[in-house]
């Protein structure tokens, strides 16, 4: 490690590749070294090495998650760990469980689908005071599950992923769909496909949910949106998205927060993680 500050780029490249290959076990030593050095350029080299080690491990975990058809919660936690590598996952899991339990206590089998969603909205947005913020790429925290829960603020994607996780845990058939320029959720009719295999995908949707606020929309509202956008409402837009596609969309949108000269490498890394989730 004494060669980390070597001015010869070839020497530094060779040393850095070796250190990164050692994995996360090398991180404590790098952190200790950082504290003993006053040279800012060398400190930045160490910080980048630590980041590269985290990214290498995270890439491996994403591949494992994809290959094992992991759940949405774990995918969202992996995405958050890109920006917060020391994320304490148990804190997030405990918070999600509290919201799930309080919601479950208010649900019953006698409720209609809209009444069920009203219960979820009441607990998530009113009792827990979750707020929706407009889509912006100035603050990555609004995309990430840990910070969205901690600050009670999330954009449509940040809030939407938590909403999907809660519905999955509560056995409510709410899924993300791929409406252009929107992150919209849909309450699905689980019995539809068995009887209507050749119909338009929108026919399996009872109604739509805006994850920013929990507001529900009817089919005519979505039809009006497509008309306004001058886009044909193709059947593919209404198919439920797999967990991999939801996290892929999260990573792609999150990457736009780093579209500047200083952080452009982060944008590239997030897009490479997204590409790993391709079918």
Model-derived features with residue positions:
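A structural boundary/capping signal
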Residues: 1-279
């Amino acid at each position: 490690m004494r060669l980390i500050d070597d001015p010869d780029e070839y020497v530094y490249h060779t040393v850095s590749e070796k250190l990164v290959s050692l994995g996360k076990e090398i991180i404590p030593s790098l952190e200790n070294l950082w504290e003993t050095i006053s040279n800012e350029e060398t400190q930045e080299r160490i910080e980048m090495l630590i980041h590269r080690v985290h990214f290498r491990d995270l890439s491996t975990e994403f591949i494992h998650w994809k290959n094992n058809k992991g759940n949405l919660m774990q995918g969202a936690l992996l995405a958050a760990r890109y920006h917060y590598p020391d994320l304490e996952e148990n804190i997030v899991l405990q918070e999600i469980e509290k919201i799930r339990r309080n919601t479950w206590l208010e649900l019953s089998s006698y409720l209609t689908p809209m009444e069920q969603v009203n219960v979820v909205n009441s607990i998530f947005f009113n009792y827990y005071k979750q707020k929706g913020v407009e889509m912006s790429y100035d603050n990555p925290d609004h995309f990430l599950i840990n910070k969205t829960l901690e600050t009670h603020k999330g954009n449509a994607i940040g809030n939407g992923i938590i909403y999907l996780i809660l519905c999955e845990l509560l056995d409510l058939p709410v899924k993300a769909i791929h409406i252009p320029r929107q992150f919209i959720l849909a309450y699905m009719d689980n019995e539809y496909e068995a009887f209507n295999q050749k119909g338009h995908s929108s026919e399996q949707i009872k109604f739509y949910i805006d994850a920013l606020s929990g507001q529900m929309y009817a089919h005519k509202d979505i039809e009006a949106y497509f008309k306004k956008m001058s886009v044909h409402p193709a059947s593919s837009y209404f198919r439920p998205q797999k967990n991999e596609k939801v996290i892929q969309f999260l990573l792609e949108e999150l990457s736009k927060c780093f579209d500047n000269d200083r952080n452009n490498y982060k944008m590239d890394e997030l897009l490479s993680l997204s590409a790993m989730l391709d079918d």
